[in-house]
Amino acid sequence: MTSTQRTLMVMAGGTGGHVFPGLAVAHRMQAQGWRVVWLGNPAGMEATLVPRHGIPMEYVRFGGLRGKGLATKFALPFNLLRACAQSLRALRRVKPDVVLGMGGYITFPAGLVTVLTGRPLVLHEQNSIAGLTNKVLAKLAKRVLVAFPGALPNAEWTGNPIRTELARTEPPQARYAARSGKLRLLVVGGSLGAAALNEVVPRALALLAPDERPQVVHQAGAKHIDTLKENYEAAGLSCGSDVALVPFIDDMASAYANADLVICRSGAMTVAEIAAVGVAALFVPFPHAVDDHQTTNAEFLAEQGAAVLVQQRDLSAELLADWLRGQSRDSLAAMAERSRSLAKPDATDEVARVCAAVAGANLEGKQ
């Protein structure tokens, strides 16, 4: 580390929705010569994922209270004090020029200590409904950034930082115009499998005449792939040239770009990625998400005619089959173009620029 090299500390953990956008910003800052250190939970996914990206880590142990018993709640003051002490030690070791909070439970104690020690804090909220931690810290932060307009008062709308390849896909007009034949459907269940989609989609496709059925790529997570295959077979559909069942998709940018329509949940990063690529989507929000934020995430696109929103309680094979019959490549292309128009493809650069500016530096060029 040179005497002029600046340091960014990223605070994020718990879920991919916090970690992956943090990684996008971290890589952007590293490309500009910044030193980046990550503050996370040793029990979180970040403890395994972040070091693989060549980013050193500091650790804070702190968890949430939702669904926990009385013992955990009574221990909160002790756990909070311990987390604050761990955060203070980490900040003293790293001496960051600016701290970026991307969410996760550890952001609360670490964010408080950041402010109390006089270091500049930048917050980024990924969801359309801010969590309690960010609602509190937003009143103390130097700059507050949001992925969805209106998520926090007096915040700057930057969008969600995404991987570079997603922001560089060919525009939807060109992609859709070059296609002919059957529609291409991508179903994304994520690592958890989205059991509702795994059950309804095969039955809906079975209700369509063979010439009405789209080509399907259905991703379901390794633990659910055998059950998914059974669901398709029970619906009378065999895997072959028109149905591909996969446990994982390595290249999501290509998967989105090759699809005419995506059926999926509406996590913050999924919505951001679909808009960035520009692809038609039918969102089925996870009904048990905190504060039902997946519904409001999906509404951001659906209210502009850039996606369709169906609640899981309303989703049926008959409803989905009827809706699919009414779609054409032209109608889906129009939806995709509206989605792309609402994207924030430069979100990674914007968040990185804010961090640099708060530290009194400039960021050059674009990723």
Curated annotation (Swiss-Prot):
Catalyzed reaction equations: di-trans,octa-cis-undecaprenyl diphospho-N-acetyl-alpha-D-muramoyl-L-alanyl-D-glutamyl-meso-2,6-diaminopimeloyl-D-alanyl-D-alanine + UDP-N-acetyl-alpha-D-glucosamine = di-trans,octa-cis-undecaprenyl diphospho-[N-acetyl-alpha-D-glucosaminyl-(1->4)]-N-acetyl-alpha-D-muramoyl-L-alanyl-D-glutamyl-meso-2,6-diaminopimeloyl-D-alanyl-D-alanine + UDP + H(+)
Localization, UniProt: Cell inner membrane
Enzyme type, top EC level: transferase
Topology term for the membrane: Peripheral membrane protein
Pathway per the UniProt entry: Cell wall biogenesis; peptidoglycan biosynthesis
GO process terms (BP): carbohydrate metabolic process; cell division; cell wall organization; lipid glycosylation; peptidoglycan biosynthetic process; regulation of cell shape
A GO molecular-function descriptor: undecaprenyldiphospho-muramoylpentapeptide beta-N-acetylglucosaminyltransferase activity
Coarse class of the protein's main subcellular location: membrane
GO cellular component, one term: plasma membrane
InterPro entries: GlcNAc_MurG, Glyco_trans_28_C, GlycoTrans_28_N
Keyword Transmembrane helix: no
Keywords: Cell cycle, Cell division, Cell inner membrane, Cell membrane, Cell shape, Cell wall biogenesis/degradation, Glycosyltransferase, Membrane, Peptidoglycan synthesis, Transferase
Glycoprotein as UniProt keyword: no
Alphabetical list of Pfam families matching this protein: Glyco_tran_28_C (PF04101), Glyco_transf_28 (PF03033)
CDD domains per the UniProt record, alphabetical: GT28_MurG
UniProt EC number: 2.4.1.227
Amino-acid positions noted as binding UDP-N-acetyl-alpha-D-glucosamine in the UniProt annotation, renumbered to this chain: T15, G16, G17, N127, R163, S191, I249, Q294
Family of the protein in this entry: Belongs to the glycosyltransferase 28 family. MurG subfamily.
Function of the protein: Cell wall formation. Catalyzes the transfer of a GlcNAc subunit on undecaprenyl-pyrophosphoryl-MurNAc-pentapeptide (lipid intermediate I) to form undecaprenyl-pyrophosphoryl-MurNAc-(pentapeptide)GlcNAc (lipid intermediate II).
Protein name, UniProt field: UDP-N-acetylglucosamine--N-acetylmuramyl-(pentapeptide) pyrophosphoryl-undecaprenol N-acetylglucosamine transferase
Annotated source species: Burkholderia mallei (strain ATCC 23344)
